Amino acid sequence: MTTISTDQVAAIARLARLAPDEAQLATFARQFGDILGYMEMLNGLDTTGVEPLYSPVQHATALRSDETAPRCTREDVLRNAPEADSEFFIVPRIV
């Protein structure tokens, strides 16, 4: 079974701008390990002769009519940003 350390989970959380506590890091590490173990099990399956699917169901997706809905204001959206000025998100420089 694949294991993932709490340090690896903390690094992933930092990238996602999350701040889990130590108990949550341990829980997430166990859950990530379970997920990766399941993926390893799926990788071990013999899929010879199985036709690839783009969807598990055979019917087409039903379309719905477009409807207008209330929108968030710029202030509402920027209020949830870790850092913003009056009009834009402020993000770390990448290059």
UniProtKB/Swiss-Prot annotation:
InterPro entries: Asp/Glu-ADT_sf_sub_c, GatC. It catalyses: L-glutamyl-tRNA(Gln) + L-glutamine + ATP + H2O = L-glutaminyl-tRNA(Gln) + L-glutamate + ADP + phosphate + H(+); L-aspartyl-tRNA(Asn) + L-glutamine + ATP + H2O = L-asparaginyl-tRNA(Asn) + L-glutamate + ADP + phosphate + 2 H(+). One of its GO terms (molecular function) is ATP binding. Its EC number is 6.3.5.-. It comes from the Bacteria. Transmembrane segments: none annotated. One of its GO terms (biological process) is glutaminyl-tRNAGln biosynthesis via transamidation. It is an enzyme of class 6 (ligase). Keywords: ATP-binding, Ligase, Nucleotide-binding, Protein biosynthesis. PANTHER family: GLUTAMYL-TRNA(GLN) AMIDOTRANSFERASE SUBUNIT C, MITOCHONDRIAL (PTHR15004:SF0). Allows the formation of correctly charged Asn-tRNA(Asn) or Gln-tRNA(Gln) through the transamidation of misacylated Asp-tRNA(Asn) or Glu-tRNA(Gln) in organisms which lack either or both of asparaginyl-tRNA or glutaminyl-tRNA synthetases. The reaction takes place in the presence of glutamine and ATP through an activated phospho-Asp-tRNA(Asn) or phospho-Glu-tRNA(Gln). Heterotrimer of A, B and C subunits. Belongs to the GatC family. This is Aspartyl/glutamyl-tRNA(Asn/Gln) amidotransferase subunit C.
